[in-house]
Amino acid sequence: VDRFIGKLDRGESMCHQMIMGAGKTTVVAPLLALLLADGKTLTMQVVPHALLEMSRNVMREKFSAVIRKPVFTFYFDRFMKIDSALYSKIKKSREMKAVVVASPTSVKSFILKFVEQAKNLEKEKEAGTGGAKKGMLGGLGFMRDKMSKVIGKKKFNEVSMGEAYYCTETLKIFRSGVLLLDEVDLLLHPLKSELNW
């Protein structure tokens, strides 16, 4: 735990291997969460989907008696909207010194949603300025009109801008936070951890 804290103070990442049953999930992760969730830094624990329930229960068990600390679950998929409610929850989690438990799929989906939002805004900008009129993306002008009808009075780009803003603000909290990866060999495996959208 001291080594992890020392590396964090120097702004470095660290990967530490421990044998099975040595207390990675039940001792080290809760201790790090206790020390790192200080109200200024979001502490997020990412575990494989199969271990999500168990890891969340371990955290809740550790932080429900003597030392009380909220434990929340971050769930996100590509069809969810990024709005002020999601941003407020993440911000409140940081302020409450909570531990946020998530699966790698949720974190990757959020990052891909950010990329998608940036791409949509770029397309909208090109369509609005008259650029990129050719090819498959050239029809964005009529897509924008259709989306405006679906949304109603709000313009498509206003909705996209709002979503992109909250996406960026949430990502800032993530980037200034700490990510605890449990079972890192599974989470970062190039063949087993891919997320196809």
Where are each of the predicted segments found?
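N-terminal pre-P-loop "Q-motif" helix
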Residues: 1-10
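Pre-Walker A (Motif I) flank of P-loop NTPase domains
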Residues: 9-16, 40-42, 96-98
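Conserved helicase ATPase motor motifs in RecA-like P-loop NTPase domains
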Residues: 18-23, 46-49, 183-187
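Conserved Walker A/P-loop ATP-binding site and its immediately adjacent core
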Residues: 25-27, 41-83, 104-111
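Conserved motor-coupling elements within RecA-like helicase/translocase cores
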Residues: 78-100, 113-124, 150
